[in-house]
Each structure stands twice: as C-alpha cells, then as structure tokens.
Amino acid sequence: MQGYGAAMRRGFREAKGDLIMVAEPDGTFRGHDAVKMLAYSDDFEVVYGTRTVKELIWKGANMGLFLKWGNYWVAKLMEFLFNSTSLTDVGCTLRCVRREALLDLQPHFTIDGSFFGPQMMVLSILMKMKMIQIPVNYTKRIGHSSVTGNKWVAFRLGLRMIRMILGYRLRSWLAPHRFPRATRE
C-alpha cells in the first residue's frame, strides 16, 4: 500500500486526539489557518480548506487557471449531485475532522491514491455530517508535485475523481442506506 490515500488512512488509524488536522508537509499551507479550522470545528464535524480564493493564493503557488478551475468545477459537480454545502475545491488537503466523525468514515475508505480527499468529502456528505469548506492561504510549494506539476497527470486525476463521484452518486441512489452513521452514547 502506498500513495497519498494510504498515508492518510495510516495516519488516521494512528491519530489519538479528539480533533485530527491534516496538512501536507510541502509548505503550501500557513500555520495560522489551523486556528481558523479549529474555530469552525466547534460547530462542524469536518472542516475542509479551499485554495481557490484569489486573495489567499500567494505568488508562486501552484494554482494556475487549469488547476483552480478544474478543482472548482469538480467541487461544484459534487455539490450539485449531492445537494451539499458550498464546495469550491476538491483537492485541498488541509482539513480537520472530529474523532467521532472519523470513526464513522474510516470503514468506508477504499482509495490509496491521490483522489482520497474527494472520497472523504463524498463520504462525509453521504453520511450527512455537518461540514463546511473555508478559505485558506495557499503558498509556494517546497519541491515538485508528481501530480499537479504535470497538467496531463492532473487532468487524468480529475477524470478519475469525476468517475468516483458519479459512482458514489449512483450507488447512493441504488442503496440509500449504505452509509449509516454509528450510534454512540
């Protein structure tokens, strides 16, 4: 098992806190955005970041028109198909999740690769979790991305995300009770 999703799943299994926050170690996110996410975690089970707000995209950040609009339109497709909260970025890896919500999500994680993030979003929608997406700073990356550094690879990843989203939409219509929440006392 290897890849972004495999690393996330392993980290989630080993995390011990009541709130679990995830950020890639490539320098693209600012530490003070964690404070914003924590503030929203009082009211929401899952807080996702969005890197698509122009004023928070720093010079040198890898968020050109292709990636920005690709992430935006795939997010809007997800929002439309599932009638969810406002979504503007399916690829942002900065997120915060409450332990109880994570315990409900974990049995349904199946993706080890680069589109694990959108799977987590779809599952949190299907499980009717209280979630929100908030704008975060996005800065220049340290090192080269093997995914977003190549437009063709990013385009193919976008198509895989769309296929996965459509698959979940179809499965949720055919078996609407497939994604129950655990009951806790």
Residue ranges of predicted features:
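Acceptor/aglycone-binding surface of glycosyltransferases and processive sugar-polymer synthases
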Residues: 2-14, 19, 31-114, 141-156, ...
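Acidic metal-phosphate-binding loop of nucleotide-sugar-dependent transferases
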Residues: 27-29
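Phosphate/oxyanion-binding loops and surfaces in catalytic or ligand/nucleic-acid-binding neighborhoods
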Residues: 80, 84, 127, 168
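Catalytic donor-sugar/metal-binding loop of nucleotide-sugar-dependent glycosyltransferases
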Residues: 85, 108-112, 121-139
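DNA-recognition element of transcription regulators
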Residues: 118
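C-terminal tail/cap regions
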Residues: 139-141, 171-172
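C-terminal, non-catalytic tails of nucleotide-sugar-dependent glycosyltransferases
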Residues: 160-185
